[in-house]
Amino acid sequence: MHVGIVAQRGNERATSLAGEIREQLRALEVTVWVDTATAEALACAGECGRDTTAFTDCDLVVSIGGDGTFLFAARGAGATPILGVNLGEVGFLNAVAPADAVEAVREEVNRYRETGAVRCREVPRVVAAGDGWASTPALNEVAIQGEQRGHGHGVAVDVRVDGSQYEATRADGVLVATPTGSTAYNLSEGGPLVQPSVDALVVTEMCGADALPPLVTGLDSEIRIRVETLDDGGEGRVVVASDGGRLTRVDPPVEMTVTAADEPARVAGPAADFFEALSKLE
């Protein structure tokens, strides 16, 4: 069995716990890979350090930190189940407490050896695609905007859902979020909260002029977004951001579709209590 470990960068507690889990797994004769930054901190870079893109070949990935660390791990893990250990304040994706981390990982290793699979649930991701390009699949949201926000930097957008026009306006941008991502960027832009069990996508305009309220639509919807011009007179590019990290830049006018990705993310271990996590947002 192969297990990958991703720890929050610059967090000594996360690095220490990563080292402890690694030693426990090695005692169980599990092959362990660690993200390159953490491997350097643990002085095992040559032996166990790997880029997170290699974690697609693992049977389980352990993310230690906050939701940002989980998103970072998910970009490289592909279909590999990810178990999140929560060192942050909220933790919508990380359900395992640090004190329970070693035992939780051990349980999944034993389950894999007994059944050939770890316990996990599928979580949708979204992807934007245009003529000859596609964004990195996003666990939280895909945001489409100009290279800068604010007066003089917005975009003119036409948004259609399953062929019907939802909105045509000027805005800083528009984002399409999953239920998981409804608590993140979407919420800060005035979008609604959506329970993780709901099969849906959320379309939220970012500071739109005379904008309609955010729209919750089906998970199987096709959202077509056309960016006609930029408010600054057409100069600059359109930025498509996946989970705020991976950026795709395209020239306007551009048309793209945003849909649920073919391959969902897989989250291992127990599910976080959605409403308990919400209470920590206050």
UniProtKB/Swiss-Prot annotation:
UniProt similarity note: Belongs to the NAD kinase family.
Active site, per annotation: 67 (proton acceptor)
GO CC list: cytoplasm
Major localization listed first in the record, in broad terms: cytoplasm
ATP-binding is among the record's keywords: yes
GO molecular function per UniProt: ATP binding; metal ion binding; NAD+ kinase activity
EC number of the protein: 2.7.1.23
InterPro entries: ATP-NAD_kinase_N (IPR017438), ATP-NAD_kinase_PpnK-typ_C (IPR017437), NAD/diacylglycerol_kinase_sf (IPR016064), NADK (IPR002504)
Catalysed reactions, semicolon-separated: NAD(+) + ATP = ADP + NADP(+) + H(+)
Localization, UniProt: Cytoplasm
One of the protein's GO biological processes: NAD metabolic process
Keywords: ATP-binding, Cytoplasm, Kinase, NAD, NADP, Nucleotide-binding, Transferase
Cofactor(s) needed by this chain: a divalent metal cation
Family matches, as SUPFAM superfamilies: NAD kinase/diacylglycerol kinase-like
Protein name: NAD kinase
Function in brief: Involved in the regulation of the intracellular balance of NAD and NADP, and is a key enzyme in the biosynthesis of NADP. Catalyzes specifically the phosphorylation on 2'-hydroxyl of the adenosine moiety of NAD to yield NADP.
UniProt binding sites for NAD(+): 67-68, 140-141, 151, 170, 172, 183-188
